[in-house]
Amino acid sequence: MWVMVLYDLPTETKAMQKAANLFRKRLEDDGFSLFQFSIYLRHCPSRENAEVHKKRVKMMLPKYGKVAVMTITDKQFGDMEIFHSKVREDPPPTYQQLELF
């Protein structure tokens, strides 16, 4: 399971710039990685864990701007086609889910 955060935050004033940088820093502190500009991804081992991280994102929302949070399955993530300058790239590696008995 992957949690994807997409955002568009205003940076017109120093306070808005600070809020946008703080939001980005908090995403990174919570284990999210930059996928594209204003798009961060985090792998979660289960749906329950993904919900925990979605709640954390909701708690750190800045006052202004747009933020979208979505979850995608490992299968959907693996089916993603990524291109860089018309050259196809492999998506970031997915993680092996360990089963404990």
From Swiss-Prot:
Its EC number is 3.1.-.-. Mg(2+) binds at residue 8. One of its GO terms (molecular function) is metal ion binding. It holds the Pfam family CRISPR_Cas2. SUPFAM superfamilies: TTP0101/SSO1404-like. Signal peptide: none annotated. InterPro entries: CRISPR_associated_Cas2 (IPR021127), Virulence_VapD/CRISPR_Cas2 (IPR019199). GO terms for biological process: defense response to virus; maintenance of CRISPR repeat elements. It comes from the Bacteria. Keywords: Antiviral defense, Endonuclease, Hydrolase, Magnesium, Metal-binding, Nuclease. Its cofactor is Mg(2+). CRISPR (clustered regularly interspaced short palindromic repeat), is an adaptive immune system that provides protection against mobile genetic elements (viruses, transposable elements and conjugative plasmids). CRISPR clusters contain sequences complementary to antecedent mobile elements and target invading nucleic acids. CRISPR clusters are transcribed and processed into CRISPR RNA (crRNA). Functions as a ssRNA-specific endoribonuclease. Involved in the integration of spacer DNA into the CRISPR cassette. Homodimer, forms a heterotetramer with a Cas1 homodimer. Belongs to the CRISPR-associated endoribonuclease Cas2 protein family. This is CRISPR-associated endoribonuclease Cas2. The lineage of its organism: Bacteria, Pseudomonadati, Bacteroidota, Flavobacteriia, Flavobacteriales. The gene is cas2.
